[in-house]
């Protein structure tokens, strides 16, 4: 889950919603106590109706039967349980199946990894597997408010199809009364946090990360998948220092030759054709890679963030990214070919990278790349403290409130 939020815009000519990302902010993911307004998602007493029920009636949602919901009867003796009507279960099937309650015997929360406007990511211990995972928790009411049911389901559907060593693997997904849960392998840090700490990367590390990302993007594009949000915050680093591409929330199946029109992603990483509202294709991901590599090499973004996509498009179109003369000639050429305004002339195919001067001597093989050490990453990870405190839950869905009031930092 990135730190960037998107807001709904108007429908495009292709019927898609326009989602415009807020400019990149320093500091990565937001941490700290949750706003008290979120408390209403877990507490519904007596005549207080579920947020989900009220939202459903207001929406007149077209996915399922639109029968009106009756108000909950008044019971003075004890409060009514706030259990969503069947529509709120069926709506997220089959990508989010209903499972027996994961509770104290299976999952224990180790800490809070990150929190954004759409949900939170928790570090959990699976007591059965004796392994640590990251669980993305998304309130159903937020999904309905933002009309992102399809987006959430497609995120899980895409991740189930992917099997690649440089992709953050999906462990499980399920739904509770009020939340959707996506469980993945746990990584202790991300590329943005490392970049914020060390600034410019050594050329050897840039070459290794670039090769790993090239393999990932080529793999996804061969499957017809556009990621659409390639950025440092969405690249996790494993215990050996190698990357794992994550967050497929904006990804979409786009067959070769087809085009997309949705304005989505993170402003400073978005290609000119995306900022202008399309049409665009898989070449947009390669522009994002160029922005990322430029930042690793220079310690800054090629173009400063603007307030919206219109201003960002003007900046990208009318300003040439000055590549420092001190950079390796091969790296300078690579950046020029990735940050090409015309997507038709942009570097994009695996064989082009294999013969590129910057990658001379690099074997584009995942197993061989994983054997190469990334010392400064592992050394940085070794200095990070970890929390030994855990919080067991009887009901992983309903008991989240107590943790969110007093989160344990991961």
Swiss-Prot record:
The keyword Cytoplasm does not apply. The keyword ATP-binding applies. Its EC number is 2.7.11.1. SMART domains: S_TKc. Keywords: ATP-binding, Kinase, Nucleotide-binding, Serine/threonine-protein kinase, Transferase. Gene3D superfamilies: Phosphorylase Kinase, domain 1, Transferase(Phosphotransferase) domain 1. ATP binds at residues 113-121, 136. It catalyses: L-seryl-[protein] + ATP = O-phospho-L-seryl-[protein] + ADP + H(+); L-threonyl-[protein] + ATP = O-phospho-L-threonyl-[protein] + ADP + H(+). GO terms for molecular function: ATP binding; protein kinase activity; protein serine kinase activity; protein serine/threonine kinase activity. CDD domains: STKc_AGC. It comes from the Eukaryota. The active site is at 229 (proton acceptor). Residues 107-274 form the Protein kinase domain. Belongs to the protein kinase superfamily. Ser/Thr protein kinase family. This is Ribosomal protein S6 kinase-related protein. The lineage of its organism: Eukaryota, Metazoa, Chordata, Craniata, Vertebrata. The gene is RSKR.
């Amino acid at each position: 889950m990135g730190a960037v939020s998107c807001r709904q815009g108007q429908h495009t000519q292709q019927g898609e919603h326009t989602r415009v990302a807020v400019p990149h902010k320093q500091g990565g993911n937001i941490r700290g106590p949750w706003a008290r307004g979120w408390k209403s998602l877990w507490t519904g007493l007596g005549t207080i109706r579920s947020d989900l029920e009220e939202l459903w009636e207001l929406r007149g949602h077209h996915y399922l039967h639109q029968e009106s919901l009756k108000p909950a009867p008044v019971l003075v003796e004890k409060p009514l349980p706030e259990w969503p009507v069947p529509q709120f279960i069926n709506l997220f099937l089959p990508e989010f199946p209903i499972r027996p309650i994961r509770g104290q015997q299976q999952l224990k929360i180790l800490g809070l990894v990150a929190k954004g406007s759409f949900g939170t990511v928790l570090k959990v211990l699976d007591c059965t597997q004796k392994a640590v995972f990251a669980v993305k928790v998304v309130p159903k009411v937020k999904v309905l408010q933002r009309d992102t049911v399809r987006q959430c389901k497609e995120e899980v559907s895409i991740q189930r199809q992917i099997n690649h060593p440089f992709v953050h693997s999906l462990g499980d997904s399920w739904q509770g009364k009020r939340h959707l849960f996506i469980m993945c392998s746990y990584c202790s840090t991300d590329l943005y946090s490392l970049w914020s700490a060390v600034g410019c990367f050594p050329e050897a590390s840039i070459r290794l990360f670039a090769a790993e990302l090239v393999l990932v993007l080529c793999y996804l594009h061969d499957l017809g998948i556009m990621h659409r949000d390639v950025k440092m915050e969405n690249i996790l680093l494993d215990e050996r220092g190698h990357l794992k591409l994550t967050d497929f929330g904006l990804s979409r199946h786009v067959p070769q030759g087809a085009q997309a029109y949705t304005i989505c992603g993170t402003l400073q990483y978005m290609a000119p054709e995306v900022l202008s509202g399309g049409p665009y294709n898989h070449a947009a991901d390669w522009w994002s890679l160029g922005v990322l590599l430029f930042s690793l090499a220079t310690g800054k973004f090629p173009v400063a963030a603007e307030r919206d996509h219109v201003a960002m498009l003007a900046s990208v179109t009318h300003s040439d990214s000055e590549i420092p003369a001190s950079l390796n000639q091969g790296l300078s050429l690579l950046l020029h070919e990735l940050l090409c305004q015309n997507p038709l002339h942009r570097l994009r195919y695996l064989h082009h990278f294999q013969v590129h001067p910057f990658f001379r001597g690099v074997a584009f093989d995942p197993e061989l790349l994983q054997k190469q050490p990334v010392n400064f990453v592992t050394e940085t990870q070794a200095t990070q403290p970890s929390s030994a405190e855990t919080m067991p839950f009887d009901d992983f869905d309903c008991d989240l409130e107590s943790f969110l009031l007093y989160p344990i930092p991961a």
